[in-house]
Structure formats: C-alpha cells, structure tokens
Amino acid sequence: MANKQDLIAKVAEATELTKKDSAAAVDAVFASIEEFLAAGEKVQLIGFGNFEVRERAARQGRNPQTGETISIAASKVPAFKAGKALKDAVK
C-alpha cells in the first residue's frame, strides 16, 4: 500500500523537484481540495475523478454494547468518485 511519503517521492521523481518541494506541492493540493469541499464546492479533475461532499440522512442506530436504539444525526461526509480514465487504468 502506498502512503503520502511514497506519493511525495513519485512527484519528486516525475518533476525533478526536491522531496521538500514535492511535499509542499502535495500538501498544497490536499489543503486546496479540503478548502473547496469545506466551502461546499465539488472538485472535478477530468480523467481522474470527482471529490464532493455527500449528506447522510439522520437515522436510527443501535448501541452494540447495550442494544439500545439511538438516534444518529445527519452529517456530511467527503466522497470520491473515480473518473473513466482512472477506472480504465486500474482494470
């Protein structure tokens, strides 16, 4: 499984940037996506995929320790949907 450091190393290799500069670039991309999503905007990267915020409806759940029915509030969650090019590359 690749992690953030692996991604930074790949960016550094592909762009001939230092790992420090690559880390700054990767962090800036992640922070920018986070800011757009927090503002309620969708991030569309053609060929790669879409990041968006989805709303989860309020629902009833169950406490696994007591079996008691509990109410789970509505919430917003980040979501990613892969684009066609990414799906094809993974096949």
From Swiss-Prot:
Q: Does the keyword Oxidoreductase apply?
A: no
Disulfide bond entries: none
**What Pfam families is this protein classified in?**
Bac_DNA_binding
Query: Which UniProt keywords are present, listed alphabetically?
Result: DNA condensation, DNA-binding
- The yes or no answer to whether the keyword DNA-binding is present is yes
PANTHER family referenced in this protein's UniProt entry, alphabetically = DNA-BINDING PROTEIN HU, DNA-BINDING PROTEIN HU-BETA
Q: Which family does the record assign?
A: Belongs to the bacterial histone-like protein family.
Q: What name appears for this protein in its UniProt entry?
A: DNA-binding protein HU
List the source organism: Streptococcus thermophilus
